[in-house]
Amino acid sequence: MSVRLVVTDDHPIMRQALAGYFSRVEEMEVVGQATNGREAVELVDQLLPDVVLMDLKMPEMDGLTATRMIVSRHPSVRVVALTTFARRDIVVEAILAGAAGYLLKESEPEAVIAGVRAVMAGQVTVSPEIARGVVEVFSARPCGGGSHQIDLTPVKLSDASLYDTADAARDS
């Protein structure tokens, strides 16, 4: 059974490149493309894909608003933010909006495919370049204080510390 994808980006070259790349991955099928958040919500309502790759900054409706709508209407649909924004506050906002992943457009194509596979396996995926900042933000939040709680299992915590180690080694 293939993973059904909707690709959402307001830049035609990016959207078409992603769709073309994913269409060559054996277990993945691009079932729709959207140019903004409103189109993405409509496509998800019609097609019920497994995963939506979502740009965040788009006209008409931004990716964060679209993510909230998609996740509230269709909890089984996984949204992966794919953006240029590495700012910690935007990453946190996307995760709190319901994104199952946050990947940077500077990522290698194989990393984006791995991210889609990870969210399909029930995991949360975050680009290594921003993982440390996300863990720092959520570890500083009081437990049970809000409606959204992030469950970091020991494996996920060890993954985060591996990213920390990799970042430190790269920064040296």
Name what the model sees in each region.
Residues 27-35, 43:
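Short hydrophobic/Thr-rich beta-strand motif most characteristic of the beta2 strand and flanking loop
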Residues 36-39, 62-65:
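Acidic catalytic/metal-coordinating carboxylates
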Residues 54-55, 66:
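Active-site T/S-Asp motif of two-component receiver
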Residues 58:
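Receiver (REC) domain active-site loop signature in two-component systems and cognate sites
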